[in-house]
């Protein structure tokens, strides 16, 4: 009956994710197959954090927080976190040091915006002004505006902006400027990589294009203050057998509540 006879379900999933990563690292596979496996890993981790991690947190906070393998759920969460950080670090290293250079050698260039020549930079700026800038909205957090809703899985740019206060307010508060957080959600209908005009297969990441033009969205902002972030929300649903007849209603409730699920990553 010893715990050593069992593998913990969530740690087993983490081990499976490692196998997916290893396929992406396998240089004997075709290049696009390797890239696909790296993408599958990201998708698997999203689902894991939306479904499994919220349940682990619930069990960690329950009075009986030891599983049949003899581990506390707090220990499991810590080990999951350690493994996921290791996986994503290795995934990023594989992508940047192997996949992207190999794509470039085959004529598909995912370039850094700073490496473009003047003509290419101008074309990307025009693309921003016509296709990207008009659909972006900067949402500030201040005493009159709560933290904005961040969609599950969306890409966002966050930054702190310093703004001069009116003279009367500055005198009352004893400070000349105020710092506040600004969030910009990148709409999912925009391309993840922006095509460079004049080159058939050259692209730059959309976040680089936005941050290079950040002052056009938030005039007091600086490119160096921008950080890309992404939220993964709790999307798990629990159905008990006795509720099966109310499945449709339960699903409707879950879909409505899911938009505001707790932040898991």
State where each predicted segment sits.
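N-terminal non-catalytic structural scaffold regions of very large proteins
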Residues: 1-265
């Amino acid at each position: 009956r010893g715990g050593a006879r069992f593998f913990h379900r969530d740690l087993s999933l983490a081990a499976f994710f490692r196998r997916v990563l290893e396929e992406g690292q396998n240089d004997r596979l075709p290049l696009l197959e390797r890239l696909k496996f790296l993408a599958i890993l990201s998708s698997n981790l999203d689902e894991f954090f939306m479904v499994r991690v919220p349940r682990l947190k619930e069990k960690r906070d329950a009075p009986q927080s030891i599983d049949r393998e003899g581990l506390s759920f707090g220990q499991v969460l810590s080990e999951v976190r350690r493994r996921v950080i290791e996986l994503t670090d290795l995934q990023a290293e594989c992508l940047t040091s192997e996949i992207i250079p190999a794509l470039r050698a085959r004529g598909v260039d995912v370039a850094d915006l700073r490496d473009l020549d003047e003509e290419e930079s101008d074309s990307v700026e025009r693309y921003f002004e016509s296709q990207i800038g008009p659909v972006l909205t900067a949402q500030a957090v201040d005493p009159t505006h709560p933290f904005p809703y961040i969609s599950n899985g969306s890409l966002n740019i966050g930054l702190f902006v310093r703004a001069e206060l009116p003279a009367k307010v500055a005198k009352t508060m004893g400070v000349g400027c105020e710092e506040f957080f600004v969030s910009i959600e990148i709409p999912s209908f925009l391309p993840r990589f922006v095509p460079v005009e004049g080159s058939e297969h050259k692209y730059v990441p959309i976040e680089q294009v936005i941050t290079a033009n950040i002052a056009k969205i938030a005039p007091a902002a600086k490119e160096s203050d921008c950080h890309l972030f992404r939220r993964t929300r709790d999307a798990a649903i629990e159905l008990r057998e006795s509720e099966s007849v109310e499945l449709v209603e339960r699903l409707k409730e879950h879909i409505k509540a899911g938009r505001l699920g707790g932040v898991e990553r």
